[in-house]
Design a protein with these regions (language model features):
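A boundary/linker detector
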Residues: 1-30, 48-52
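Generic recognition of well-ordered alpha-helical segments
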Residues: 37, 41-44, 79-82
Length: 86
């Protein structure tokens, strides 16, 4: 799937209130695991404050609904712990 197709698919999911399908996709799971590994499963917000918390989520810095073109862009993703992922 190229980026244009990805954006179209995500926009369709948003219109149909089914964005969960994106988060359950193999595309997302693959990138999500890469980010967790690259960031050592560590919450990046806690790390910036000088503490350690294990990451449980991968967060879109620029929100997916506003920026579907960045859905799988690694520079737009960060690991967060449960407390920091709101």
């Amino acid at each position: 799937m190229n980026n244009v197709q990805l954006v179209q698919w995500i926009n369709t999911l948003i219109r149909h209130h089914n964005i969960k399908a994106f988060y359950n996709s193999a595309l997302w799971e693959h990138v999500r695991l890469e980010i967790l590994e690259e960031q050592h499963y560590e919450c990046q917000m806690c790390k910036a404050k000088g503490s350690y918390s294990p990451a449980e989520a991968v967060h879109h810095i620029k929100f997916l609904k506003q920026h579907p073109e960045l859905a799988l862009t690694k520079s737009n993703l960060m690991c967060l712990c449960k407390e920091c992922h709101y």
